[in-house]
Curated annotation (Swiss-Prot):
Reactions catalysed: 5-enolpyruvoyl-6-hydroxy-2-succinyl-cyclohex-3-ene-1-carboxylate = (1R,6R)-6-hydroxy-2-succinyl-cyclohexa-2,4-diene-1-carboxylate + pyruvate
EC number: 4.2.99.20
Family as reported in the entry's similarity comment: Belongs to the AB hydrolase superfamily. MenH family.
Source species of the chain: Salmonella typhi
Top-level taxon: Bacteria
One term of GO molecular function: 2-succinyl-6-hydroxy-2,4-cyclohexadiene-1-carboxylate synthase activity
EC primary class: lyase
Descriptive protein name: 2-succinyl-6-hydroxy-2,4-cyclohexadiene-1-carboxylate synthase
Function: Catalyzes a proton abstraction reaction that results in 2,5-elimination of pyruvate from 2-succinyl-5-enolpyruvyl-6-hydroxy-3-cyclohexene-1-carboxylate (SEPHCHC) and the formation of 2-succinyl-6-hydroxy-2,4-cyclohexadiene-1-carboxylate (SHCHC).
Gene3D superfamilies per UniProt: alpha/beta hydrolase
Length: 252
């Protein structure tokens, strides 16, 4: 089995760019950024529970990473960069720490390296469980209205929140809930030690107004690019800034 994806061929011999979206996003999430790198082959993936992969069930990160590997093989992607956001980051960081053939480098935007104690994990498990129940049983417009009131999204304007709520409400609440539980930060290992020892290029993008994740970026051995005029969702709030950073990273 493989994940649904959109593939755009590029010039032969160049590494592919593999984009992984955040929770409640889909393969369109990174398109405005990826389109600026038309010389590169690009693969925009739908993670389980989302978009064209909504019907694919998973029990945890191990299943997601197995599907990611199978998808890369099916598209004959042998040399690539992983570029992700939030949930997509956490998937790609775990995959990178475990080792994934052909990986040239890792670009993380607002990704959490993992909680560091059992109390924090227990609190997160409880919080994610409450959100999952809401996704299963309440209208998605109401759930996402509240979702985007969380402190991490404080930099969004009212118009941006409204647009995101409308967009994300097109999802399936049941499959979102299942993916949220399967890949909760509560079940993610603390990756700091392994991330600090990675032997390939590792870059971290974060919005200048995202103080929480700017602090987390300092805890891993990554080169940090601060995106001006942006918060947690930097590639949506300032896509041009993210494109500029990616161009520097990829030397394009």
């Amino acid at each position: 089995m493989m994940l649904h994806a959109q593939h755009m061929p590029g010039q032969p011999g160049t590494p592919s760019l593999v984009f992984l979206h955040g929770f409640s996003g889909d393969c369109r999430e990174w398109q405005p950024v990826g389109e600026q790198f038309h010389g590169c082959s690009r693969l925009n993936i739908d993670l389980p529970g989302h978009g064209g992969s909504a019907a694919i069930p998973v029990g945890g990160f191990a299943d997601v990473i197995r599907l990611l590997r199978a998808t890369l093989i099916s598209y004959n992607i042998l040399k690539f960069w992983l570029v992700g956001y939030s949930l997509g980051d956490r998937v790609q960081m775990i995959a990178s720490c475990q080792g994934i053939p052909g990986l040239c480098g890792l670009v993380v935007e607002g990704g959490h390296p993992g909680l560091q104690n059992e109390q924090a994990r227990a609190e997160r498990r409880l919080s994610d469980g409450r959100w999952a129940e809401r996704f299963r049983h309440e209208p998605l417009t109401e759930v996402f209205h509240d979702w985007y009131q969380q402190p991490v999204f404080a930099s969004l304007t009212a118009q941006q929140r409204q647009a995101l709520t409308a967009l994300r409400s097109q999802n399936n609440g049941e499959t979102l809930a299942a993916m949220l539980e399967a890949t909760s930060l509560a079940v993610q290992p603390d990756l700091r030690e392994v991330l600090n020892a990675l032997a390939f290029p590792f870059y971290y993008l974060c919005g200048e107004r995202d103080s929480k994740f700017r602090a987390l970026a300092q805890e891993v051995a990554a080169t940090c690019h601060v995106i001006r005029n942006a918060g947690h969702n930097a590639h949506r709030e300032n896509p041009a800034g993210v494109v500029d950073s990616l161009a520097q990273i990829l030397r394009l």
